[in-house]
Amino acid sequence: MNNRVHQGHLARKRFGQNFLNDQFVIDSIVSAINPQKGQAMVEIGPGLAALTEPVGERLDQLTVIELDRDLAARLQTHPFLGPKLTIYQQDAMTFNFGELAAKMGQPLRVFGNLPYNISTPLMFHLFSYTDAIADMHFMLQKEVVNRLVAGPNSKAYGRLSVMAQYYCNVIPVLEVPPSAFTPPPKVDSAVVRLVPHATMPHPVKDVRVLSRITTEAFNQRRKTIRNSLGNLFSVEVLTGMGIDPAMRAENISVAQYCQMANYLAENAPLQES
């Protein structure tokens, strides 16, 4: 028997499809999400409705974004969810979550078992809409969750950690073994909760500058910032901010990256493209 077939649907490798089928895990995730009637609930990648059904049972209305045409069609004819669903057969990477929040008249609560092959770029796409999002709950590769929650001075700490924590409070929820899926992925998974900050703990004047600094620093993470960011900051400027030029990218806190971004935004602002 082909272990990529689940409920009559062949999992597509190009979409990174692995279908959740462990009831205990499903119940735990739904409990963590705690959906309530009247909330603007949005699921990314509902697949075969493992989360859609138990979440939808608690709601009068649920919005789903599904790239796979066959799966979107299955949801349209779902025996009890169909009338509750608003289905966007679209790539979440190009979806405008701000427009949807405006249409629904409230911030979105976004959740999903995300395809692991696009999870990191999708996170960055969602970060650009955090003013339209109340919270997010995602199943991700465990290694990605580790990176999201990592602090300075750890191997997992990187650009994703800094940008996620700049935008959100990041909370790991539970770990999930490969056996909870069909077909089983080759990696462990985990569920994470991301809650956009109501008030930014480390406001920056231009988030594009923060993105640039973290990209340049972590692209050369083994170099000291005296070298990796030498084109942006002199040793004197770094020292003046209380940042040791001999530190590497992984030693610098989110607050310090934001401090550096604000200095650069004031003294060498990016030109509007």
Swiss-Prot record:
InterPro entries with a match to the protein in the record: KsgA/Erm, rRNA_Ade_diMease-like_C, rRNA_Ade_Mease_Trfase_CS, rRNA_Ade_methylase_Trfase_N, rRNA_adenine_dimethylase, SAM-dependent_MTases_sf
Q: Name one GO cellular component term.
A: cytosol
Molecular function in Gene Ontology: 16S rRNA (adenine(1518)-N(6)/adenine(1519)-N(6))-dimethyltransferase activity; RNA binding
User: Where in the cell does this protein reside?
Assistant: Cytoplasm
Q: Which Pfam families match?
A: RrnaAD
* Keyword check for Repeat: no
User: Which Gene3D superfamilies does the record associate with it?
Assistant: Ribosomal RNA adenine dimethylase-like, domain 2, Vaccinia Virus protein VP39
Q: Where does S-adenosyl-L-methionine bind?
A: N18, L20, G45, E66, D91, N113
Protein family membership: Belongs to the class I-like SAM-binding methyltransferase superfamily. rRNA adenine N(6)-methyltransferase family. RsmA subfamily.
Q: What is this protein called?
A: Ribosomal RNA small subunit methyltransferase A
